[in-house]
Amino acid sequence: MKTKPYLSFTRHPEEKEILEKWWKEFKNNPGDRAALRRCRSAAEIAFIPYFHRLRLDLIKIAYVQPQSLARVAGIMSHVKNYDESNVWSIARQMAARKEGSDQPRVSDLRFRRLLAVDDADELYGSMIRIVRLLGGAVDIPSLADGIYWWNGRTKNTWAYDYYSEAPTKK
């Protein structure tokens, strides 16, 4: 099998399947999930064997940036629910209205602060807070791609997605 030049959980079905399977196994491995949830940085995640299961499965089919994937794994440990029928990007989920409110689930100010983040460890903490604001229910492939490929292009895409969905002020 030829190795893909880059990893994408939204564009490559095989990589998406590996990530989903790995995440679903959390339900049967509460100790592993708890170990990942206690980590405060990608550097700490490197010491968790459960992370390496994901890394080793993915490295067979695509080039993997270990630190970026570690951030994905750590943040994924905070995801409680994955609605596979959800076709919205993570940024659109952030912009969706709170139940019974005209306010977005993630405020405009918090979203703009997120887009200003360049430091990987700061991104890690910010995204854990975002997952919590979303009630732990997110689109897993979209979240994973955004974290893995955190750069200007990702930020731009997220901005367009968020502001396409966000309630407008009159």
Predicted regions and their residues:
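Basic, alpha-helical nucleic-acid-binding regions used in initiation and control of genome expression
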Residues: 2-5, 9-170
